[in-house]
């Protein structure tokens, strides 16, 4: 084809921008960002279409935008970082189908569903080799090569001599349920026409990777019967010559699936280091609601090891760079805002759009953020099912009994990143790298699995332990009950694949090769943030309650919560507003949040005088001088290390604020606004003394349960000082982070004057929100009218009230039915007094009784309580106790045991 003929098969606009090349305008082989046809994902795949959409909107190429979309674009343009999407052209599915058409008869033979077998990995390896060898032998047509040349020369003229990214994009897999992520080829930093052309061919070849074939074969309802002719496309993008940091932005918390958050995973160099899972990246989580209010939205940060970086080649990172954040919290906040706005934009443009998985990079020299990819998050599900996980020997607070603890192999700093679950299995440990490891992996896996089956039969599954997983491992991963990796993060191949396939997994598990030995039988507890592994086969059960058709509770049933790290997961498992359950919290335990910081607030405030404070204990006979000096220096060093560049007080305030915000943020989002009752610290003196530095400031009491605690403790001379620092943290959460769904609760109020004085201190700290109190002392009941006057609401603390009414040990076994009956009469008296004297006074209850006794929960409703709170595991039993009926008279509860037995509504299935 001569130049005149070649240029006849393309079209440019009046400003010299390529519209299409090759084929025809109706069925082009190549389209550019300046052609609206590139927005057709059936032509170019969702990945390419969405990238082009961002480019067109940021560059003013779309004149027909809704006012909301234009507002979002304007907000993106006003960010501290300049937001761009790189120019690109796309090789369409038309071009791919023309290339593949002559090969289809042979390809269909290789991909015959009568030959492929999900249980036979070798069948997919053979199909991969046969298909790819066939494609490699076929040259591109002259016409196609020239069309690519036209597109490349146009792209290079607009941005000369920069590297290009050549990415596969599969129209059939870029939806909200199925993802082609990681299954096909991506070639980064390609220079010149020949490298780009060869990279396009490599992408075509990768269409038949065995991981992709296995994935498609296992879902015929999505991909059809003919695997040979599935749609496929390739995008060719400009790249920045220099990238400082890169990674992923998810517009939902991927661990809990909560849509109210943005998750950032970034490292030095190109984003391949994060996406592949090869590097443990820095990770930030921001709440969207504060970001929308232009307030501090940072909820959590975890420093990654960042062992290596990738700039086209892999390099070892310096210890200095590994030990520090790859970017500031302020930059991460800007990234989160940009990601949130882009998610808003995609939902505005497509009402069926789900939350977004974005890849981005930053060039600090040009103050530019480059959005390199966007796809749907495929793992977001919120079923009307409540699951309760029970492991023998583990209580509701996550504490192990002696028997279970004796078998603990590893409780890792790694991350549970798959489906929450408990499982047991025999370890298959496979480590290595390079072509030889890839070649032998499947064979070794099958050999080990056969040995396990021969020994244990089919009732014991296998748990894969490896450095990281890849799409080519998927046929083997299909045969596991869990996957454990020593590298990677929450959003690389392992967790994405495991979530899509309903499996638990843990990533970045240090020590796994040492403690999880090949061939050993283990139990994996994959619930919550941190994975735990136990030797042997422990009994467990998973209880599933179907919620569809259940009647709602007549009053709100809220939660008792105390762990910021699991709050988002608890919310997503328990928040069902249509049933009036899981609606915020009637008790957030401050002391458990503060204990995460490990240090007494007075030690933080007195960090410069710790030695003299501890030396006072010498005169009291509580320490030797040597112990006092050594302890003071140890506490001071801890505070210095944790505070870093901040002052100790600023560090403490910010860290405590993050813990509080971590609890309340899941319940204050774009779509959720539920009250969170935060109880001010109720440390007993012995508990407070256990914190670092606490012995210097806490007295030794014979009975801390009845000693210096609650409201009275805040009013001592030095206690007012540390209450001030605690209130400063709370004020930051309310005023600087914007969480106005918080209510404050004061514990252990002995007199109305105590309540008034605490209220004054709270107001002086800049906090102006409702102030409740705990009704947990007998005097709170007998003098209720006086306490109603000094409080904006209250929660009955049934644990302490029961203990103090009868002088009982509330955790002992000597509580009788008569005690409960008397307690009920006291609660009835309080409710009646409220109804008579101050009917608008909101009264709830939190304590063990409704959590452990559904009958008591029902009684509370009948007695006229406004709400009550239970532990998350007790939520559904409490609901069933309250409504007293279920669909068709059945509770619709299924229990799965460790032995593989299934019980439905108490009957063995």
Locations of regions flagged by a protein language model:
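Acidic, glycine-rich flexible loop/linker segments
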Residues: 1, 13, 103, 107, ...
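Beta-sheet entry/capping signal
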Residues: 82-90, 163-164, 233, 247, ...
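Conserved catalytic alpha/beta cores of large enzymes that bind or transform nucleotide phosphates
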Residues: 262-365, 461, 612-669, 733
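Generic beta-strand/beta-sheet core signal
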Residues: 86, 92, 167-169, 237, ...
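Extended active-site and interfacial segments that coordinate phosphate-rich ligands
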Residues: 181-214, 242-312, 371-413, 480-486, ...
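N-terminal beta-alpha lobe that positions the nucleotide/phosphoryl donor
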Residues: 1-235, 244, 323-330, 335, ...
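Conserved alpha/beta-domain cores
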Residues: 172-180, 243, 339, 550-909
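Conserved phosphate/anionic-ligand binding catalytic regions in large, soluble enzymes, centered on
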Residues: 17-48, 53, 67-68, 77-99, ...
